[in-house]
A protein has these predicted regions:
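Alpha/beta-hydrolase fold active-site loops
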Residues: 41-44, 74
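Structural microenvironment flanking redox-active thiols in thiol-disulfide oxidoreductases
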Residues: 55-120
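Bacterial N-terminal signal peptides
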Residues: 1-8
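N-terminal "domain-start" segment that seeds a small globular fold
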Residues: 13-37, 57
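Thiol-/selenol-based redox modules, centered on thioredoxin-like
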Residues: 124, 128-174
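Short pre-active-site segment immediately N-terminal to redox-active cysteine/selenocysteine motifs
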Residues: 42, 48-52, 80-83, 148
Length: 174
C-alpha cells in the first residue's frame, strides 16, 4: 500500500511549494515572459544549453526536432546556463551565437542557474517531481514533460535529441 502511494505522489505535477508546471514562468532570451500556461496540451522538451560545451553541436538536432514536431504540439525550450561555467555572460551574446551558428528559432530563456540553491523554479520543480535524475549533471541535459505537465523522463547530455529513445517518447506523447 505504501509503494503505490509513493508512486502516485512522484507523478503529481506539483513542486514542493505547491506549484504545478503550468504555474511556472521564465523570461525569454529577450526579456519577455514565457508563461507555461501557454504550454498546456503541449509536450515540452526542456534542455539546459551552453555555448562553450562539447555538446553545443546538439543545437542543430534540437532545431531539427523543433522543426519536425512543432506543428504536432512539441515545444523545445532551451535554457542557457552558466552553472557549469561554459556559457556566455550576456543574453544577447547567447541569442546572437545561437542564431548565427545554428539558425535557432525555438524558444530560449534568459541565462539561468539549473542546479543548487539558486536554480530557477523550473529546475526546482523538476527535482521535486522526478528526483535527482531531473537535476542536470552537465549541459544539454533534457527533461521531457507530457501534455498534462508531468515529467515523462530525463535524458543525459550524451543522449542526442534525435535519438530513437527521445523520438519514441515524444511521438508516444504527442
Amino acid at each position: 500500500l505504501i509503494l503505490p502511494m509513493i508512486f502516485f505522489f512522484k507523478n503529481e505535477a506539483y513542486s514542493n511549494d505547491g506549484k504545478k508546471f503550468y504555474d511556472l514562468k521564465i523570461n525569454d532570451i529577450s526579456g519577455k515572459v514565457i508563461d507555461f500556461k501557454d504550454y498546456k496540451d503541449k509536450v515540452v522538451l526542456i534542455v539546459n544549453t551552453a555555448s562553450y560545451c562539447g555538446f553545443t553541436k546538439q543545437y542543430t538536432d534540437l532545431q531539427t526536432l523543433w522543426e519536425k514536431y512543432k506543428s504536432k504540439g512539441l515545444i523545445v525550450l532551451g535554457t542557457p546556463s552558466n552553472s557549469f561555467n561554459q556559457e556566455k555572460k550576456e543574453n544577447k551574446e547567447v541569442k546572437d551565437f545561437c542564431e548565427f551558428n545554428f539558425n535557432i528559432n525555438f524558444p530560449l530563456s534568459e541565462i539561468i542557474d539549473v542546479k543548487g540553491k539558486n536554480a530557477h523554479q523550473i529546475y526546482k520543480w523538476a527535482k521535486s517531481n522526478f528526483g535527482n535524475s531531473a537535476v542536470p549533471k552537465w549541459n544539454f541535459h533534457k527533461i521531457l514533460v507530457n501534455k498534462n505537465g508531468q515529467i515523462i523522463d530525463t535524458f543525459a547530455s550524451f543522449t542526442n535529441p534525435m535519438s530513437n529513445k527521445i523520438i519514441r517518447e515524444i511521438e508516444k506523447s504527442l
